[in-house]
């Protein structure tokens, strides 16, 4: 079995964006990468994130909301921050760990009816999915 590279998705609360990213990455990168996600804090898995990912056939309901694990952070090959807060507050990583920032809106901040909120979750879900698919195809 070949050694997989480690990708670590970070956002503020590990409830929406990084959870969706973990789900997409397991689909697109699972053969070559070990996929993890975490937050500066752990806010619990957002039920709307679970719902909209299920719509595209990806079950994230068993993923857990975790705070950043220094051990994973320090041995990751790639750390991806998904919000400005995580980019600003992410612990220092060793020089061998590549860090990139892919910014996405926070769907948990969406206002309006339940349907309007879900529309924002779907948009962010699709944006994250497209970004990870591009990374899977191009390596960047």
From Swiss-Prot:
Keyword terms of this UniProt record: Arsenical resistance, Cytoplasm, Disulfide bond, Oxidoreductase, Redox-active center
One cellular component term from this protein's GO annotations in UniProt: cytoplasm
Signal peptide: none
Gene Ontology MF terms: arsenate reductase (thioredoxin) activity; protein tyrosine phosphatase activity
Cell compartments where the protein resides: Cytoplasm
Disulfide bridge positions per record: 11-83, 83-90
Enzyme nomenclature, EC number: 1.20.4.4
Main location: cytoplasm
CDD domains: LMWP_ArsC
Catalytic activity: arsenate + [thioredoxin]-dithiol + H(+) = arsenite + [thioredoxin]-disulfide + H2O
GO terms under biological process: response to arsenic-containing substance
Active site: 11, 83, 90
PANTHER family: ARSENATE REDUCTASE
Described function: Catalyzes the reduction of arsenate [As(V)] to arsenite [As(III)].
Annotated family: Belongs to the low molecular weight phosphotyrosine protein phosphatase family. Thioredoxin-coupled ArsC subfamily.
Name of this chain's protein: Arsenate reductase
Lineage: Bacteria, Bacillati, Bacillota, Bacilli, Bacillales
Gene coding for it: arsC
């Amino acid at each position: 079995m070949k050694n997989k590279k480690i990708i670590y998705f970070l956002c503020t609360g590990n409830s929406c964006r990084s959870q969706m990213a973990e789900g997409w990455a397991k689909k697109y990168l699972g053969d070559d990468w070990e996929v993890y996600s975490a937050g500066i804090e752990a806010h619990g898995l957002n039920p709307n994130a679970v719902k909209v990912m299920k719509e595209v056939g990806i079950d994230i309901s068993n993923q857990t909301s975790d705070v950043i694990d220094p051990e994973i952070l320090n041995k990751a090959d790639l750390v991806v921050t998904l919000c400005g807060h995580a980019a600003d507050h992410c612990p220092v990583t060793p020089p061998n760990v590549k860090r990139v920032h892919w910014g996405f809106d926070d769907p948990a901040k969406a206002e309006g009816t339940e349907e309007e909120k879900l529309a924002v979750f779907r948009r962010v879900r699709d944006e994250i999915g497209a970004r990870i698919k591009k990374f899977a195809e191009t390596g960047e």
